Design a protein with these regions (language model features):
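Transmembrane beta-strands of outer-membrane beta-barrel pores
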Residues: 64-72, 108-114, 152-156, 184-186, ...
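Sec-dependent signal peptide recognition
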Residues: 1-7
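Signature for the C-terminal beta-barrel architecture of outer-membrane proteins
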Residues: 141-148, 161-323, 383, 395-411, ...
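Predominantly the C-terminal beta-signal and adjacent terminal strand-loop region
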Residues: 418-451, 455-456
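Extracellular/periplasmic loop regions
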Residues: 16-40, 276, 286-399
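N-terminal periplasmic/intermembrane-space "pro-region" immediately following the signal or transit peptide
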Residues: 12-82, 122, 306, 310, ...
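Surface-exposed loop and membrane-interface regions of Gram-negative outer-membrane beta-barrel proteins
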Residues: 70-88, 98-144, 161-165, 202, ...
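Residues on the lipid-exposed face of transmembrane beta-strands in outer-membrane beta-barrel proteins
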Residues: 62, 92-96, 132-137, 178-182, ...
């Protein structure tokens, strides 16, 4: 019986700990490395450095990312040259835990751009500054808890369609303000009031954007059969917000719900991500009435070679009729940079659009994955133009009644060399449709990007 007990205990002792590098590095948890027997990675000695008191330690980490980008006919030919440039990202963080009730997290960022014709965009370059620097007070090691966080921080919720750290571009998005995180039963709830951080090309000179205020409440919980639901409210107050109809002060209230099931990892199964949003508020002396619905439905065959996943996205968001007193243009607020895959920072965004987006993914041996997709896009309202991913106007309607914007086939190859390093290549062509041919030079966008990254 004694030997049986030892055998039963072995799986518990050999339990594999989570060594995931999260999108938000503040969510990395290396406390299990307090046990020296768990230390097996080269970087483990700096992942848990005890500070002498109970539950007191500091953890260090970082990231290096190099990207070669080439864009031909940017903005469908408004810039006809082939623009080739290099983007470099360097990030370093430290996470101090003082007991179970106090935590200080600081993350430095440096984004550098070289060789781009026209110079760096705001998303390309930030010489050196704090990406995050916050103090958190409260104990999360309870069944129900609440903690207060104040300082510079990142926000990322749900699928990232509306609130994201802007991971694709070279410089990530951060905010200055306060946030309360809480757990009540099965609900995880966040509430915040912040201002976006303005990235200026220089050293430690970022400031909050005092023309914009952003606040919200986001709640999520598991439901049943691997399905979870999110409910949220987002508030945005912007001075001089710009749309095709003009510029004015914008007060926008966003109410949304999301139902989702993650991609299958063990047994063959379907996955989905459905999200519906309405937006109300005021724009100048008029009102705001906007909406969107987004869907992503897939199936993963985990029991066949290459573990393929086939999926299709279908999305729609409202556009504007400038002749009415009500602004109908949907705002993506702070969206994910690569929601449409390749062409993330140069193609059209999820504003005034209808799209169908089939995709295929497969897992090859030795950590290599491949994907291929096609995005086909139309305008929802022919009186409104085409907008970029962040929501600013790219091509005005210019009287065109054509609805078809174009289509973009693309492909991606990624080699996850080990848990730290990866190489990736993206390629896409956006073929201009009838609207772009009528309202712009209408040339096809060619896009190539090569990535190399390392996290620790």
């Amino acid at each position: 019986m004694r030997y049986c007990g030892l055998l039963l205990a072995l799986p518990l002792c050999a339990q594999v700990q989570d060594r995931t590098y999260n999108l938000l590095r503040e969510n990395d948890d290396w406390s299990f490395l307090a046990d020296p027997s768990q230390r097996s990675d080269f970087w483990d000695p700096i992942k848990y450095v005890p500070l002498g008191c109970n539950a007191c330690y500091v953890s260090f980490g970082g990231e290096i990312r190099e990207a070669f980008e080439q864009v031909g006919n940017d903005n469908w030919g408004k810039q006809r040259y082939s623009n080739t440039f290099l983007l470099q990202r360097y990030m370093l963080h430290a996470d101090w835990h003082v007991g179970k009730n106090f935590r200080f997290f600081v993350q430095l960022k440096s984004g550098v751009e070289d060789f781009r014709a026209g110079g760096p965009r705001p998303i390309d370059e930030k010489r050196l500054d704090f990406e995050t620097a916050f103090l958190e007070v409260g104990n999360t090691h309870k069944k129900n808890w609440a903690v207060l966080r104040t300082g510079r921080q990142e926000l990322n919720y749900g699928s990232g369609r509306l609130v994201s750290v802007r991971e694709g571009p070279n410089v990530r998005q951060s905010f200055d303000g306060v946030k309360i995180r809480a757990k009540a039963g099965e609900w995880n709830i966040d509430a915040w009031a912040v201002r976006p951080d303005l990235d200026k090309p220089g050293f430690f000179n970022n400031t909050p954007d005092h023309t914009t205020a952003f606040w919200g409440l986001y709640a999520t919980r598991p439901w049943r059969r691997r399905v979870s639901c999110d409910l949220y409210y987002l508030g945005l107050d912007r001075k001089n917000a710009a749309f095709e109809r003009g510029s004015a002060t914008e007060l926008r209230h966003t109410i949304g719900a999301r139902l989702w099931r993650p991609v299958a990892k063990e047994e063959p199964a379907s996955d989905f991500d459905y999200e519906g949003v309405v937006q109300l508020g005021s724009f100048g002396s008029g009102d705001i009435r906007a909406w969107t619905f987004a869907s992503d439905t897939g199936y993963t065959f985990t029991n066949v070679p290459l573990r393929p996943r086939f999926s299709i996205k279908a999305d729609i968001s409202s556009g504007d009729n400038p002749g009415s007193h009500t602004l109908g243009t949907f705002s993506p607020i702070y969206p994910i940079g690569n929601y449409f895959g390749v062409l993330a920072d140069t193609g059209p965004g999820p504003v005034n659009f209808i799209d169908v987006h089939p995709r295929m993914q497969a897992q090859l041996p030795h950590g290599v994955s491949i994907s291929a997709d096609v995005v086909v896009q139309w305008r929802e309202n022919v009186d409104d133009g085409v907008y970029a991913v962040p929501g600013f106007l790219l091509v005005a309607a210019n009287g065109s009644r054509a609805r078809f914007v174009g289509y973009r086939p693309g492909a991606e190859v990624r080699w996850q060399i080990d848990r730290h390093a990866y190489l990736q290549a993206d390629y896409g062509i956006f073929y201009a449709g009838q609207f772009l041919k009528e309202a712009s030079p209408g040339r096809n966008i060619n896009y190539v990007e090569l990535w190399a990254g390392y996290k620790f």
